[in-house]
């Protein structure tokens, strides 16, 4: 099989996910079920994102000053430390941070890691847009509206140091769901309906096209 005809039936973007329904008509395909499984396998194994959070460190200062410049002493705490002045516990903040999705400029593939910082000064609610990224880094946060935590009191300040790595040992698959069904039409014959669900860091249709590169279509 050398040619595939693709129809986009549905393309929806939501807050935390992207959904695509594709109609796929492979030409001269002897086994449609095998072809569908090969696409599913390629999407699960080959579509990876390697920019992930690999370490999170918390530091607190109990200074009563509201002026950030006067805060000099921060003490490290672990994620199981209970802070009354913060609504969420630190372990839940870790979970929220790991929901963040990152994009990296592909032109700069030499940067293997970077550190980003979140300072909780003079605000009550903090989201991904409050994270400070070094100006020298090409890293971008995709879901800037992702909520991280709320402060109940300004008596304490929390500093979060986050390590982001571009490493093959740390990766996740942005494809969340893959389903396919085989259908038959009297006019065009057999075809495959592919249901793709991904996080907001990737377009499902582009992921599908990328997955085809790993298939030997001539032998399918």
UniProtKB/Swiss-Prot annotation:
What this protein catalyses is: RNA(n) + a ribonucleoside 5'-triphosphate = RNA(n+1) + diphosphate
Q: What is its main location?
A: plastid
Location relative to the cell = Plastid
* Record's keyword terms, sorted: DNA-directed RNA polymerase, Nucleotidyltransferase, Plastid, Transcription, Transferase
* EC number annotated for this UniProt entry: 2.7.7.6
A single GO molecular-function term is: DNA-directed RNA polymerase activity
Q: What class of enzyme is it?
A: transferase
- From the UniProt record, give one GO term of the biological process aspect: DNA-templated transcription
- Where on the tree of life does the source sit, at the highest rank? Eukaryota
Kindly list the GO CC terms recorded for this protein: DNA-directed RNA polymerase complex; mitochondrion; plastid
Q: Which InterPro entries match?
A: RBP11-like, RNApol_insert_sf
Instruction: State the family it belongs to.
Output: Belongs to the RNA polymerase alpha chain family.
The free-text function statement in the UniProt record for this protein reads:
DNA-dependent RNA polymerase catalyzes the transcription of DNA into RNA using the four ribonucleoside triphosphates as substrates.
Q: What does the subunit comment say? A: In plastids the minimal PEP RNA polymerase catalytic core is composed of four subunits: alpha, beta, beta', and beta''. When a (nuclear-encoded) sigma factor is associated with the core the holoenzyme is formed, which can initiate transcription.
Protein name in the entry: DNA-directed RNA polymerase subunit alpha
This chain's source organism reads Euglena longa
Recall the taxonomic lineage recorded for the source organism: Eukaryota, Discoba, Euglenozoa, Euglenida, Spirocuta
UniProt lists the gene as rpoA
